[in-house]
């Protein structure tokens, strides 16, 4: 959005004198704080999907609420580098904000990955209730505070599915596959139990890896599969709906703390408000992605009901098994599972 600066031109000496007197009556620091424009570069790995849609509505909201004092520019589709580079840029200040699935922040704090525990949520509605839980928000948005980050947003994008070059119609078809996963031990352990070799990879690298045969498939959401033209390399998506893909919005802490207090409040307020506003959009985008996938010639596959249940039984202990390796991780896992139960009970 374009920032328009107002210019005042003194047409006569008398008018200039009045203006100069008024300006001198205002403390210099206050005038500077009001007039300064703060550039906010926002990075995200997706395009025309839930994370970048959140970035867009957040950017518009903070520009409006700040009266143009914050100029927010969104860089979707990993324009500012791979996911690890986007995270580093946000930590160290070359980028002011990143909107990225929480598991990829695991290098900052391993507790970011707890959202990837299989079976945590059964639906997007439950996932959206989970992200609104005060205990969950307090935990997730506090992570990384000692590593240069300030959390402002948390929401569920969609469930995970698996795209593959050959169809995965049964649990047995997972065995021996090399699949890209997110950067989470919860995911690598889960798919390992299904006989998969997990390969952690940034989203922008997945399509070339599929085309080159480096991997057999990938875990991601229907949004990226459709919007990033994955059908050029693979046409089969198995709708396992696990785990949920949760996204955090992190701001560079040093940049944030240097802002005037009123602008800090706007960023925090809009981060939370747009985390709620995105929910209906996420549901709509998911529905359209599913329809677009089949309309473009892709196939959406559901495991037989008994095999889906068997898969969930196989994965049921992953969360506890992975989290028990570290007390902090175990505590975070308990906070999320307790909140998930509250969300489930309230539906």
Task: Describe the residue ranges of each PLM region.
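Twin-arginine (Tat) signal peptide motif
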Residues: 1-16, 21-22
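N-terminal secretory/targeting leader peptides
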Residues: 2, 34-127, 135-347
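Local alpha-helix boundary/kink/capping signal
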Residues: 20-21, 28, 333
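Sec/Tat signal peptide C-region and signal peptidase I cleavage site
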Residues: 26-33
């Amino acid at each position: 959005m374009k920032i328009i600066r107002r210019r005042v031109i003194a047409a006569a000496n008398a008018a200039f004198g009045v203006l100069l007197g008024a300006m001198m009556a205002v403390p210099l620091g206050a005038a500077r704080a009001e007039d300064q424009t703060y550039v906010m570069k926002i990075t995200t790995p997706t395009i025309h999907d839930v994370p970048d849609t959140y970035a867009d509505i957040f950017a518009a909201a903070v520009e409006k609420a700040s009266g143009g004092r914050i100029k927010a520019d969104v860089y979707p589709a990993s324009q500012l580098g791979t996911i690890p580079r986007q995270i580093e840029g946000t930590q160290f200040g070359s980028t002011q904000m990143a909107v990225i699935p929480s598991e990829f922040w695991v290098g900052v704090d391993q507790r970011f990955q707890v959202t990837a525990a299989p079976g945590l949520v059964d639906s997007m509605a439950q996932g959206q209730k989970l992200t609104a839980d005060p205990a969950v928000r307090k935990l997730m948005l506090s992570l990384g505070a000692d590593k240069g980050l300030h959390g402002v947003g948390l929401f569920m994008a969609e469930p995970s599915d698996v795209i593959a070059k050959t169809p995965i119609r049964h649990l047995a078809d997972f065995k021996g596959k090399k699949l890209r996963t997110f950067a989470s031990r919860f995911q690598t352990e889960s798919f390992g139990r299904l006989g998969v070799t997990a390969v952690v990879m940034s989203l922008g690298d997945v399509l070339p890896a599929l085309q080159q045969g480096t991997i057999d498939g990938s875990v991601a959401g229907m949004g990226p599969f459709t919007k990033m033209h994955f059908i050029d390399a693979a046409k089969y998506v198995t709708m396992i709906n696990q785990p949920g893909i949760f996204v955090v919005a992190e701001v560079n802490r040093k940049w944030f703390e240097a802002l005037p207090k009123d602008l800090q409040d706007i960023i925090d307020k809009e981060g939370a408000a747009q985390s709620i506003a995105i929910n209906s959009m996420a549901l709509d985008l998911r529905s359209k992605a599913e329809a677009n996938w089949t309309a473009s010639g892709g196939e959406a596959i559901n495991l037989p009901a008994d095999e889906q249940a068997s898969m969930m039984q196989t994965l049921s202990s992953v969360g506890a098994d992975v989290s028990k390796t570290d007390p902090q991780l175990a505590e975070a896992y308990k906070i999320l599972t307790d909140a998930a139960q509250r969300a489930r009970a309230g539906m």
